[in-house]
């Protein structure tokens, strides 16, 4: 997919400028080959994938990597590239405010299909761009009394693995 190609271009650009490149898993709990069938092949069906995903999470837990206090360590002046050079453009789009309250997560199953009920968390865009913690949402969903929200997050990881293993 596009993002893999983009990351390779950025890595090359940084290397050419003698800047180290670090790649971190941050938008999923399990990536690439961490949830595969016993024969090492990727899943093509959601249900067995989700069962293995849940079993692994229950066994290993959800790691916590708090980063809120690290933002000031980022460089504010960067002459290597700008956001436009890596494909970003300015937008006037206003995003919906997300809601990850216990009320939303606990009532997700009964309200998610009714637009008038305001029953979704509206975190899709934030998850996509990594501005909200996937691990925190997974942990919160797991601790709730409703597994539907957790299964939606697992579906997101399943879909990303499908895109990785079967890019056509």
Segments from the language model and where they lie:
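Trp/Phe/Arg-rich N-terminal binding region typifying the photolyase-homology
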Residues: 1-57, 145
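Glycine/tryptophan-enriched, flexible segments
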Residues: 48-167
């Amino acid at each position: 997919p596009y993002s893999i190609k983009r990351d390779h271009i950025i890595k090359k650009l940084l290397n050419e400028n003698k800047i180290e490149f670090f790649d971190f898993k941050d938008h999923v709990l399990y990536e690439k080959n961490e949830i595969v069938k016993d024969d090492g092949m990727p899943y093509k069906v959601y249900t067995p994938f989700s069962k293995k995903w849940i079993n692994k999470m229950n066994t290993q837990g959800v790691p916590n990597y708090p980063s809120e206090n690290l933002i000031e360590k980022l460089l504010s002046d960067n002459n290597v590239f700008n956001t436009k050079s890596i494909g970003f453009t300015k937008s006037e789009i206003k995003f919906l405010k997300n809601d990850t309250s216990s009320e939303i997560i606990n009532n997700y199953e009964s309200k998610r299909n009714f637009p008038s009920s305001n029953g979704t968390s509206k975190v899709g865009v934030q998850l996509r761009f990594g501005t909200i913690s996937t691990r925190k949402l997974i942990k919160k969903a797991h601790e709730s009394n409703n597994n539907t929200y957790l299964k939606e997050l697992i579906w997101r990881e399943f879909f990303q693995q499908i895109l990785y293993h079967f890019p056509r």
